[in-house]
Amino acid sequence: MNFLAHFFLAKREPAWVVGNFVADYLRNAEIAELPEAVRAGVALHRSVDAFTDRHPVVRQCAQRLFPFHGKYAPVVIDVFFDFFLIHNWERYSEEPFDVFVQKMYDILLEYREMLPQGLQERLPRMVSGGWLHSYGHIQGLEYAFLRLQSRMSKPEQLQGVIDSHHRYFDATNQDFNDFFPEVIAFASDWQVR
């Protein structure tokens, strides 16, 4: 799951949204210093990632993309699934997408001081660049993958990623819609523990 799906699964609880945002950017020692509710958001993020990585539908999708993107196939799926969440939004939420996105940006801006320095610096670009909206169109996907390539040891494995998106559009959309209700149920169950 990428930013958008993690925010969706955080149920708009501000501290959990923040925890989901910082989860991949902090070491465990730094996470231990966060308020308890934010740590719960980090734990939710990590639990969702583990559930996602083990899920048979996601594994099937990764196998389909592995010949083209190697070990980065799961990363490609994370971004593709945000695309399909946007395109299937009304199936999963009664709240308009634009309203949801603005709420997420408002939460992150309100809690900006809790973010690590790098995310504090990136957040204004994320908001002004409409990153969450951008996952819903091809140009935005291209830009997201360019950002990812700059942090990868084998960036060449993301070449042709938009071709993969087009080639497997219907299959990946079906995979997303088979998987997403199950991860929603998992996250809801996790949150009531």
Label each region the model flagged.
Residues 1-89, 164-193:
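An N-terminal structural lobe/cap that precedes and organizes the functional/catalytic core
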Residues 13, 92-95, 136:
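Short coil/turn linker and secondary-structure boundary residues
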Residues 19-20, 94-98, 157-161:
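Short coil/turn segments at secondary-structure boundaries
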Residues 28-29, 86-94, 151-156:
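Short helix-capping/linker segments at secondary-structure and domain boundaries
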Residues 77-107:
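Primarily interfacial, aromatic-capped hydrophobic alpha-helices that serve as membrane anchors
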Residues 101-185, 189:
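An amphipathic alpha-helical core segment
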